[in-house]
């Protein structure tokens, strides 16, 4: 009887562990794919394809997806709610590349599809390595349209910035962008999202 109970408990523990792993994997399930076609000083640098984690952070993922397509039209700022034509305004080697300010172009602006700012959805996903897509902010619950893509592990940002996607193709392009950066963050060249949109899964 005791042996049977031990086997049962062991089986339950195993299933519990598998379920826990599966739950974590589900959070990282790609629900949408979007792209940036990037130009550096007017010359094509290639395409970055990003997978969005819509199950883990649906509101944050939807904001980014819609800003890639431009489907929401013009925002309260009077500017199109669209990443197309916007710059990577802050690039720091061995850290990240930041963009998404389509209203000011210098890191002082941006706008979400929900209005100016929206709350941090959750911090379930972590900054585990290069290619992680996360929301840039100016403090708690100040998400707009600005985002960054990591080029290294940035675990100190966990719990402070909402992770909502990953680069699934084109990390070579991300590294090309990174090479245009300086420790001050000011790019050496003009790095622009020449086009953006959504791709089929």
UniProtKB/Swiss-Prot annotation:
It is found in: Cytoplasm; Membrane; Endoplasmic reticulum; Secreted. Interacts with EMB30/GNOM. Belongs to the cyclophilin-type PPIase family. Its main location: cytoplasm. Residues 35-198 form the PPIase cyclophilin-type domain. It comes from the Eukaryota. GO terms for molecular function: peptidyl-prolyl cis-trans isomerase activity. InterPro entries: Cyclophilin-like_dom_sf, Cyclophilin-type_PPIase, Cyclophilin-type_PPIase_CS, Cyclophilin-type_PPIase_dom. It comes from Arabidopsis thaliana (Mouse-ear cress). PPIases accelerate the folding of proteins. It catalyzes the cis-trans isomerization of proline imidic peptide bonds in oligopeptides. May be involved during embryogenesis and organ development by regulating the folding of EMB30/GNOM, and thus, by modulating its activity. This is Peptidyl-prolyl cis-trans isomerase CYP19-4.
